[in-house]
Regions:
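Structural signature of hydrophobic alpha-helical transmembrane segments
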Residues: 2-14, 55-68, 129-137, 195-204
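C-terminal ends of transmembrane helices
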Residues: 17-29, 70-87, 143-160, 209-219
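Transmembrane alpha-helix boundary signature
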Residues: 48-62, 74-83, 102-117
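Conserved small/polar residues in nucleotide/adenosyl-binding loops
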Residues: 251-258
Length: 258
């Protein structure tokens, strides 16, 4: 199939996303906006499947779609309207994790197949992968903490535990140190691109950063935090779109979605 048709598919999906987001701004048009967003996602998925020739593996594709649809439907049906902020926090985390997993798969594939790029391409690709991993895993753990705070607590060994709000002044220094360490690890991964251990170190730092960023914030401010995490999830997806050369992710990911 001609590449022009794939670009047209991405353009149509991006248009549906944009119009859907605009309609989400008013309660009367929000249901229609949600439908347009779903149609845009369907168009994007179909375009990717056709462009990458993944339709030759129908069992894997159908299984993934069925599993994702089942989990999403179950969560959306069971959660009351008052629990929507918690659900949005979870979806933000899942979106960030998806972007981070794609980055992880890309770097693993390049190392295993010995197709690591050279020169400027290496610096650009590995930096984008590192930033996608950093923002994605940070969004996941931060969203999980936000979910626990909105819910008020969680069950541990059959006992209800309240989510703590803990943030001494010295924790700000720890946040800065973790962020600086993450940047150093990304730099080291560029200088030693075949060292997969750097990836695990970056994942650990990013997960820890997400926790310490959200932990000091009280439950009353969680909607603001969820909105910020939503934006970070979009940024992680944009980095991923750059990594895999997917224009649809670049068009729509940075857009605010709530």
């Amino acid at each position: 199939m001609d590449n022009q048709w794939f670009q047209l598919g991405y353009l149509i999906s991006a248009g549906l996303f944009i119009f859907g987001l605009k309609m989400l701004g008013h309660p009367r048009t929000a249901p229609r906006g949600n439908q347009l967003g779903a149609m845009g996602m369907l168009m994007a998925v179909l375009t990717v499947l056709l462009e990458t020739d993944l339709v030759t593996r129908p069992v894997l594709i159908i299984a993934g779609i069925a599993l994702g649809a089942a989990i999403g439907s179950l969560l959306a049906i069971r959660v009351e309207m008052t629990g929507m902020p918690e659900l949005v926090a979870l979806f933000n985390g899942f979106g960030g994790a998806a972007s981070a997993l794609v980055a992880l798969a890309e770097i693993y594939s390049a190392i295993e197949s010995d197709t690591i790029p050279k020169g400027l391409e290496l610096h650009v690709a590995w930096t984008a992968i590192g930033l996608s991993a950093l923002v994605g895993w940070m969004t996941l753990t931060g969203s999980l903490v936000a979910f626990a705070k909105l819910k008020g607590g969680f069950m541990i060994l059959g006992k209800w535990r309240r989510t703590p709000t803990w943030g001494p002044s010295w924790l700000n220094g720890v946040k800065g140190l973790i962020m600086l360490s993450s940047i150093v690890v990304i730099y080291l991964s560029v200088t030693t691109p075949d060292d997969f251990q750097m990836v695990w170190v970056l994942i650990l730092l990013a997960c820890l950063l997400g926790v310490v960023l959200v932990l000091p914030i009280g439950g009353a401010d969680m909607p603001v935090v969820v909105s910020l995490l939503n934006s970070l999830s979009g940024i992680a997806a944009a980095f991923t779109g750059f990594i895999i050369s997917n224009p649809c992710l670049l068009y729509t990911s940075p857009s605010p979605r709530d």
